[in-house]
Amino acid sequence: LMVVTSNADRICTGITSSNSPHVVKTATQGEVNVTGVIPLTTTPTRSHFANLKGTQTRGKLCPNCFNCTDLDVALGRPKCMGNIPSAKVSVLHEVKPVTSGCFPIMHDRTKIRQLPNLLRGYENIRLSTSNVISAETAPGGPYKIGTSGSCPNVTNGSGFFETMAWAVPKNKTAMNPVTVEVPYICAKGEDQITVWGFHSDSETQMGRLYGDSNPQKFTSYANGVTTHYVSQIGGFPNQTEDEGLKQSGRIVVDYIVQKPEKPGTIVYQRGILLPQKVWCASGRSKVIKGSLPLIGEADCLHEKYGGLNKSKPYYTGEHAKAIGNCPIWVKTPLKLANGTKYRPPAKLLKERGFFGAIAGFLEGGWEGMIDGWHGYTSHGAHGVAVAADLKSTQEAINKITKNLNSLSELEVKNLQRLSGEMDGLHNEILELDEKVDDLRADTISSQIELAVLLSNEGIINSEDEHLLALERKLKKMLGPSAVDIGNGCFETKHKCNQTCLDRIAARTFSAGEFSLPTFDSLNITAASLNDDGLDNHTILLYYSTAASSLAVTLMIAIFIVYMVSRDNVSCSICL
């Protein structure tokens, strides 16, 4: 038997946090209240588009071509000639149908509006200095090169697109289809984008210009793609695109993409617009829908939110295409555990007693310390002292950082792998891109959520292990100078003020230094038996007599029960 009387101090281990618990999801325990969390998601707000940090970003194809659409630049409108800067990223800012301020074009008959987008997809773009075909002497000629007042040049004279030559035959006669080969004239490794087309008008104008008022046939072939056209005769109202003279005629414009060293062919009749200067393009530029102007810089360009600066690894909200150092879309907000399981003080006081409540309070939050720090606290006459254990805290931080980095690296790799596969597929099934992109996003989101659940499980278990290790170290340092009262707390045989606690945190504590006579120590006195005049023999006699009597009584009782059970003895009870 031991009697404990004390006026000593208590020292407890714990982890700091806010007083309010946080909830995280785990793989096997479901939702768990923890002492701290790291938010992993943010919900962005809409902003203007910007230049991507550290990356050449292209807005307009030709920034110095004023009052020109990107289609003007792509077709080589006389007043819209200029250099296209190199760029790793291009912003598709012309989302509505765009016209060209030149001769009226029948946009709906071809994919010509896609030409600027095609060019945006290249990092390096240049217009050839020489013509790919000698238009005057092409098959079916000789030709006179036509111009139009609807397409004024820099001196406001009649002009035409730099990428095409309007081949008006000198001999006004009908012509069977003829073929011209389009040679590859770009540098090795460049794709050649060759623009061509044809002109059609009323029967009267077709007869006057070409000597044939019948519909004409045209065919292009390059890179395994064949396209056929038949011209439409008449029925056009007088109009112009943006400026210049109104025209009753129309032009149909198309393009072919020629891979390195691969020629193309064009089969045509009257009204041909022969290829002239060609676009030579190389490298890849990522394209994203957006708007101009580009203001400032951003980590990420997002089709729905504009320019974003990454503050969290993941985001919730609208999913859309994004490029750059972007957060990854997830369905629901995610939190990473940054502490131990939360234990409410009131519950601990009821179930584990006063000292259990103290331990729970410490794990629930210490005032005056940064959230997430491991350390010690002492309670006594000096009040409350708190000291952080830097080594244990750093180990915990490293563990959480490792989980966070591993989580990020894992998902970035998955994103890159899935994106790469889907981008390749996208080239074959463009019409399914949005559905494929949604499927990709859902897949990645599910993987991220599972990874966070597993990480939370590991972090919570790891934090509990850190606290147990901290408790073992404290017990070893205190040695016989303290009594383990459970729940990470010890009652010391000496006072432990802030200096004492700092020594413990620094691992330089010496019990002898604080076990001075001036301190009130833990008084433990053995219980003693009072002497009432009885010696040891008398006590032993009393004990043996009582034991013998008890044994005899038990034997008699057992015998009576046995006899009654065999009907050898009857027992009657009378009142």
Swiss-Prot record:
<keyword id="KW-1168">Fusion of virus membrane with host membrane</keyword>
<dbReference type="GO" id="GO:0019062">
    <property type="term" value="P:virion attachment to host cell"/>
</dbReference>
<dbReference type="InterPro" id="IPR001364">
    <property type="entry name" value="Hemagglutn_influenz_A/B"/>
</dbReference>
<dbReference type="InterPro" id="IPR000386">
    <property type="entry name" value="Hemagglutn_influenz_B"/>
</dbReference>
<keyword id="KW-1161">Viral attachment to host cell</keyword>
<keyword id="KW-1162">Viral penetration into host cytoplasm</keyword>
<keyword id="KW-1160">Virus entry into host cell</keyword>
<comment type="subunit">
    <text>Homotrimer of disulfide-linked HA1-HA2.</text>
</comment>
<keyword id="KW-0348">Hemagglutinin</keyword>
<keyword id="KW-0564">Palmitate</keyword>
<feature type="glycosylation site" description="N-linked (GlcNAc...) asparagine; by host">
    <location>
        <position position="67"/>
    </location>
</feature>
<keyword id="KW-1133">Transmembrane helix</keyword>
<keyword id="KW-1164">Virus endocytosis by host</keyword>
<comment type="similarity">
    <text>Belongs to the influenza viruses hemagglutinin family.</text>
</comment>
<keyword id="KW-1015">Disulfide bond</keyword>
<keyword id="KW-0945">Host-virus interaction</keyword>
<keyword id="KW-0812">Transmembrane</keyword>
<feature type="glycosylation site" description="N-linked (GlcNAc...) asparagine; by host">
    <location>
        <position position="33"/>
    </location>
</feature>
<feature type="topological domain" description="Cytoplasmic">
    <location>
        <begin position="565"/>
        <end position="575"/>
    </location>
</feature>
<dbReference type="InterPro" id="IPR008980">
    <property type="entry name" value="Capsid_hemagglutn"/>
</dbReference>
<keyword id="KW-1170">Fusion of virus membrane with host endosomal membrane</keyword>
<dbReference type="GO" id="GO:0019064">
    <property type="term" value="P:fusion of virus membrane with host plasma membrane"/>
</dbReference>
<feature type="glycosylation site" description="N-linked (GlcNAc...) asparagine; by host">
    <location>
        <position position="523"/>
    </location>
</feature>
<feature type="glycosylation site" description="N-linked (GlcNAc...) asparagine; by host">
    <location>
        <position position="153"/>
    </location>
</feature>
<protein>
    <recommendedName>
        <fullName>Hemagglutinin</fullName>
    </recommendedName>
</protein>
<feature type="transmembrane region" description="Helical">
    <location>
        <begin position="544"/>
        <end position="564"/>
    </location>
</feature>
<feature type="disulfide bond">
    <location>
        <begin position="68"/>
        <end position="80"/>
    </location>
</feature>
<keyword id="KW-0472">Membrane</keyword>
<dbReference type="GO" id="GO:0039654">
    <property type="term" value="P:fusion of virus membrane with host endosome membrane"/>
</dbReference>
<feature type="glycosylation site" description="N-linked (GlcNAc...) asparagine; by host">
    <location>
        <position position="536"/>
    </location>
</feature>
<dbReference type="Pfam" id="PF00509">
    <property type="entry name" value="Hemagglutinin"/>
</dbReference>
<keyword id="KW-0946">Virion</keyword>
<feature type="glycosylation site" description="N-linked (GlcNAc...) asparagine; by host">
    <location>
        <position position="309"/>
    </location>
</feature>
<dbReference type="GO" id="GO:0055036">
    <property type="term" value="C:virion membrane"/>
</dbReference>
<dbReference type="GO" id="GO:0016020">
    <property type="term" value="C:membrane"/>
</dbReference>
<feature type="topological domain" description="Extracellular">
    <location>
        <begin position="1"/>
        <end position="543"/>
    </location>
</feature>
<comment type="function">
    <text>Binds to sialic acid-containing receptors on the cell surface, bringing about the attachment of the virus particle to the cell. Plays a major role in the determination of host range restriction and virulence. Class I viral fusion protein. Responsible for penetration of the virus into the cell cytoplasm by mediating the fusion of the membrane of the endocytosed virus particle with the endosomal membrane. Low pH in endosomes induce an irreversible conformational change in HA2, releasing the fusion hydrophobic peptide. Several trimers are required to form a competent fusion pore.</text>
</comment>
<feature type="disulfide bond" description="Interchain (between HA1 and HA2 chains)">
    <location>
        <begin position="12"/>
        <end position="489"/>
    </location>
</feature>
<feature type="disulfide bond">
    <location>
        <begin position="496"/>
        <end position="500"/>
    </location>
</feature>
<feature type="glycosylation site" description="N-linked (GlcNAc...) asparagine; by host">
    <location>
        <position position="238"/>
    </location>
</feature>
<dbReference type="GO" id="GO:0075509">
    <property type="term" value="P:endocytosis involved in viral entry into host cell"/>
</dbReference>
<keyword id="KW-0449">Lipoprotein</keyword>
